[in-house]
Amino acid sequence: MLAKTLLALFAATAVAANPVAHDDRAVSIEDRADIEGRALCAGNLIDGPRKLSIGGTLRVYYSSAGGGTNCAYVTNDLGKEVFMYISLQDTSSSAFRLDDDYGDFSQFAGAVKLDGMAKHCFQVLVGIDGKTWMSRKDWHCGGGKVA
């Protein structure tokens, strides 16, 4: 009987501590988008969550894999489906390199990724519902953070 009581107590504690694993209704739209987005971006979070004035939250990751991989996505903080755009552009290369994602999204746009970025800088452009935000061109050079 004691073992059964302890097991029930442990299960109730685990559910309360981790509602995502047991009850999808307990997860906010932004948290759900963040969980899904993180599954797409490997590596370490090097910037973010950065709240953008245009209604989104940007996250940027860096991994040493693939000669240095940068990955980014932006969550939709507006609570409705809107046109979203995100691009990641290598600004250190003479060859134009860009990855982008766009469409009508209710949760997030991205993930966008560029490999071979270990000694390169990049720029991020985000568009949400007709408004835009752009980083500096010399942002996150070589996987490090530039404020």
Per-segment meaning from a language model:
Residues 1-25:
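Fungal secretory targeting signals
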Residues 21-147:
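Post-signal peptide N-terminal regions of Sec-secreted extracellular proteins
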